[in-house]
């Protein structure tokens, strides 16, 4: 992998999208310290705070999800989607990424759609056993779809699927907490199996 790779990571809305995205960025930086990474998220969503706190630059799109209860409100949603696609096109043109990664959430839709239209390879990362709407819509143009669970060919083209598991932040893997420490901290019985629900 070249050290001067330029990568856009797009998506968010919830921690289920943001933290895997940060894990991907961290893994790329670990292998390619000179990599330039730009996040693209949704304005006024949690990624706009979490991503800069992790040390990465992020640009927000005015995109929002569809309102399934109040259909007339979707006129504004469609307008924001068109504005987001135009803004995503400008971001991509200015940043010139080598690849665009989508982690789900409605912010990844305009970004990856425009990247694909501009001939930039796109990769999707699906964290769930039931694929999200945005990733399903982007699957056809994606070069690769990384999934955490088997059986995802019911949502995605089988030839594009790579079973990778979910990205995990390095700091979680490097913990010094032992099983015995955890049992003591939570006051659990070490002789019993524990299931977290």
Placement of each model-derived feature along the sequence:
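Glycine-rich phosphate-binding loop signature in dinucleotide/nucleotide-binding domains
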Residues: 32, 90-96, 186-190
């Amino acid at each position: 992998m070249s050290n001067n790779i330029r990568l856009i990571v797009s998506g968010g809305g919830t921690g289920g999208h943001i933290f895997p995205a940060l894990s991907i960025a961290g893994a790329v930086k670990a292998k390619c310290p000179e990599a330039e990474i730009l996040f693209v998220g949704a304005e006024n969503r949690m990624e706009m705070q979490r991503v800069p706190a992790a040390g990465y630059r992020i640009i927000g799109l005015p995109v929002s999800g569809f309102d399934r209860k109040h259909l007339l409100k979707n006129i504004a949603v469609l307008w924001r989607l068109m504005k987001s696609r135009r803004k995503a096109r400008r971001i991509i043109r200015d940043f010139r990424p080598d690849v665009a990664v989508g982690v789900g959430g409605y912010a990844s839709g305009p970004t990856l759609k425009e990247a694909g239209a501009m001939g930039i390879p796109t990769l999707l990362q699906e964290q769930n056993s039931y694929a999200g709407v945005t990733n399903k819509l982007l699957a056809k143009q994606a070069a690769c779809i990384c999934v955490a669970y088997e059986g995802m060919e019911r949502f995605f083209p089988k030839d594009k699927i790579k079973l990778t598991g979910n990205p995990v932040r390095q700091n979680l893997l490097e913990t010094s907490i032992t099983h015995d420490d955890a049992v003591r901290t939570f006051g659990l019985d070490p002789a019993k199996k524990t299931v977290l629900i």
